[in-house]
Amino acid sequence: MRHEQICVSKNEGNVVMTGLFNEVKKHADTDPAEFWAAAAQDVSWIKPATIILDDAKPPFYRWFVGGEINGCYNAVDCHVEAGHGDRTAIIYDSAIIGVKEYISYAELQDWVARCADVLLQNGITYGDRVIIYMPMIPQALVAMLACARIGAVHSVVFGGFAAAELAKRIDDATPKMIITASCGLEPGRVVAYKPLIDDAIELSAHKIDNVLLYQREMCKAAMIDSRDMGLG
């Protein structure tokens, strides 16, 4: 059963939806390899898998052996290539600052490509770790997608974490770069992120050479010339 074949009218109610869910779940439980092989046809592969499920050494299972895929392409580029570049990809709605923005797939593709280029220019490559320490703004999604685009591994750390907690995560992940914003917003206050970043790097055993920072108008951060760079 292909997933796009499951279409339920709002008028059909929860009973029909529950029945379809149970049918899909039964398929997945009965023949997981066939189920996920069908699901895999709904995304674009750079190189298709030669084996869907390798269960030769349980409990260590391997899925989509030999396959190669780019999550960023499937999330962004494929929609632009299909002629949907003008459609909305992200709706940013901030009650705190009273802003609502609509970002198209074409705009998102441009932002992500430019961010990915900055990562590559600063030596971030396939398999490298990047910590993303940002508020819930579109630039956080851009950073995640840019990492996925080049095969870097991103670790999202809650923006506003204390320096000591961030330092622990720096030592755990040993990232080559931190992507951050100058501040985050909470009801009634602005939380400056850059001092927390600076203190965390000072506390951590693992040192980071690159900090990519998005300056927000409500709190501009001081930059360290030898380490910090702006995210446009």
Language-model regions: role of each:
Residues 6-75, 79, 214-215:
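Flexible, non-catalytic linker and terminal segments flanking ANL/adenylate-forming cores
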Residues 28, 76-80, 108, 112, ...:
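Adenylate-forming
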Residues 33, 113-117, 171:
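Solvent-exposed alpha-helix faces
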Residues 53, 75-103, 215-223, 229-230:
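AMP-dependent adenylate-forming
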Residues 72, 90-145, 162, 166, ...:
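Conserved AMP-binding/adenylate-forming core of the ANL superfamily
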Residues 81-83, 119-122, 168-176:
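Glycine-rich phosphate/diphosphate-binding loops that line cofactor/substrate pockets in enzymes
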Residues 145, 149-232:
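Structural core segment of the AMP-binding/adenylate-forming
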